[in-house]
């Protein structure tokens, strides 16, 4: 099933836009409103599973926290394992970490060292692509463990914030269901 224009418009309309959140001048795209609609949520998962069902994916990685909400059901639909990437000190087993830049400062992500095996074909899933910094750090973690990442999937792409171009420079093909301007 290829996504139809009607299906994509339905998904787009299920995402609420909140002006001046979290600070003045920001138009926040609230994917939690999509989660509140079981038809929209199910459709978003079905479309991602359909796109990647024959891609040879062996693991799906989701980034904290909303990436878990989409990545885990996509992994189930593909019949593969799900691997969470989390903020520091949230995973109980041995981890490796990757630091990445924020607008003001840095942050860090971690993954279990035994979660990805050399040669795993990994799909990264998150709710939203903006500047691409979080996903770039996630991809670095996966590659450090020997995993192969060629694709990342998103519900929303804030297309004018440069994330897709940033990830393409890392050899990542980005796919999103709903494009929005970031400003």
Curated annotation (Swiss-Prot):
Transmembrane helix recorded as keyword: no
Pathway: Purine metabolism; AMP biosynthesis via salvage pathway; AMP from adenine: step 1/1
Reaction equation(s) it catalyzes: AMP + diphosphate = 5-phospho-alpha-D-ribose 1-diphosphate + adenine
Disulfide links within the chain: none
GO BP field: adenine salvage; AMP salvage; purine ribonucleoside salvage
E.C. designation(s): 2.4.2.7
Signal peptide residues on this chain, from the entry's feature table: none
GO terms for cellular component: cytosol
Gene3D superfamilies, sorted: 3.40.50.2020
Localization annotation: Cytoplasm
Domain of life, source organism: Bacteria
Primary localization class, coarse: cytoplasm
GO molecular function: adenine phosphoribosyltransferase activity
Keyword list, A-Z: Cytoplasm, Glycosyltransferase, Purine salvage, Transferase
InterPro entries registered for this protein in UniProt: Ade_phspho_trans (IPR005764), Adenine_PRTase (IPR050120), PRibTrfase_dom (IPR000836), PRTase-like (IPR029057)
HAMAP family (UniProt xref): Aden_phosphoribosyltr
Subunit note: Homodimer.
Protein family membership: Belongs to the purine/pyrimidine phosphoribosyltransferase family.
Record-linked PANTHER family: ADENINE PHOSPHORIBOSYLTRANSFERASE, PHOSPHORIBOSYLTRANSFERASE DOMAIN-CONTAINING PROTEIN
Biological role stated in the UniProt entry: Catalyzes a salvage reaction resulting in the formation of AMP, that is energically less costly than de novo synthesis.
Protein name as annotated: Adenine phosphoribosyltransferase
Gene: apt
């Amino acid at each position: 099933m290829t996504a139809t224009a009607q299906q994509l418009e339905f998904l787009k309309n299920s995402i609420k836009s909140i002006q001046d959140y979290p600070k003045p001048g920001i138009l926040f795209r609230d994917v939690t409103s999509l989660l509140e609609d079981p038809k929209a949520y199910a459709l978003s998962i079905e479309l991602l599973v359909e796109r990647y069902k024959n891609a040879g994916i062996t693991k799906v990685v989701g980034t904290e926290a909303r990436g878990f909400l989409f990545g885990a059901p996509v992994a189930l639909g593909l019949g593969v394992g799900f691997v969470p990437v989390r903020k520091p000190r949230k995973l109980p087993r041995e981890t490796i970490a990757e630091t990445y830049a924020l607008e003001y400062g840095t942050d860090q992500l971690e993954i279990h060292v035994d979660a990805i095996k050399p040669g795993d074909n990994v799909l990264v899933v998150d709710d939203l692509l903006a500047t691409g910094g979080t996903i770039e750090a996630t991809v670095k973690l996966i590659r450090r463990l020997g995993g192969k990442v060629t694709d990342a999937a998103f519900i929303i792409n804030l297309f004018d914030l440069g994330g897709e171009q940033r990830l393409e420079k890392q050899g990542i093909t980005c796919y999103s269901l709903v494009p929005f301007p970031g400003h």
